[in-house]
């Protein structure tokens, strides 16, 4: 396992694991209580995490197919996306998740996901009160019914800015983690995302 966190800031973390048990322990703070490797071979996993208060980013990667179960925070609304060139590389609650889907935002549903080999899973958690306040200010009517669908399939052009944003965050995690520890950069990221 390696850790890149030169300033000791607990709000930004980047770790690599070559052991599933250590990876499983590291994702427990994400309320994932079970993580099982489904494909044979050596395990390599990466966790990148940044907590900016009302906004949290998590990037998970593993070189093997895995299944995760757990519970979600009742205080946050989460949005997840998978990054992989193939159309379908994840299953959540028994339903295929495509590369043009946002999923996992119903806080009343537990975590139940299977991801294939070499899939990048990027999650954003927004404080529920802040999320609904911003949604209302922006004129969005996100009813309980919409949120309980737990997945939205979006047109690729509609999703392009969010995918690009997630790719940039993931790139910064992997190449310049120390930038995420700077308050000015955190403010810029929060403004851009929200």
Where would I find each of the regions flagged by the language model?
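N-terminal low-complexity or simple alpha-helical regulatory segments
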Residues: 1-75, 80-81
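Alpha-helical bundle regulatory/interaction domains
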Residues: 2-17, 24-30, 34-37, 88-194
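Well-ordered mid-protein domain cores that form the structural environment of catalytic cofactors
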Residues: 57-58, 64-111
């Amino acid at each position: 396992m390696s850790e890149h966190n030169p300033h000791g800031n607990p709000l930004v973390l980047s770790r690599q694991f070559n052991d599933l048990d250590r990876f499983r322990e590291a994702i427990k703070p994400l309320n994932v209580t079970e993580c099982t490797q489904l494909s044979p071979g050596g395990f390599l996993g990466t966790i990148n995490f940044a907590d900016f208060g009302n906004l949290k980013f998590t990037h998970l990667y593993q070189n093997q197919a895995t299944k995760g179960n757990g519970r979600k925070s009742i205080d946050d609304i989460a949005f997840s996306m998978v990054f992989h060139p193939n159309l379908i590389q994840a299953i959540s609650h028994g339903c295929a998740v495509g590369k043009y889907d946002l999923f996992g935002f119903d806080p009343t549903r537990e975590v139940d996901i299977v991801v294939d080999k070499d899939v990048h899973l990027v999650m954003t958690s927004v404080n529920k009160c802040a999320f609904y306040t911003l949604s209302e200010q922006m004129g969005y009517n996100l009813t309980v019914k919409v949120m309980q669908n737990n997945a939205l399939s979006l047109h690729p052009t509609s999703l392009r800015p969010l995918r690009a944003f997630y790719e940039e965050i993931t790139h910064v995690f992997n190449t310049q983690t120390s930038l995420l520890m700077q308050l000015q950069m955190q403010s810029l990221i929060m403004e851009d995302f929200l």
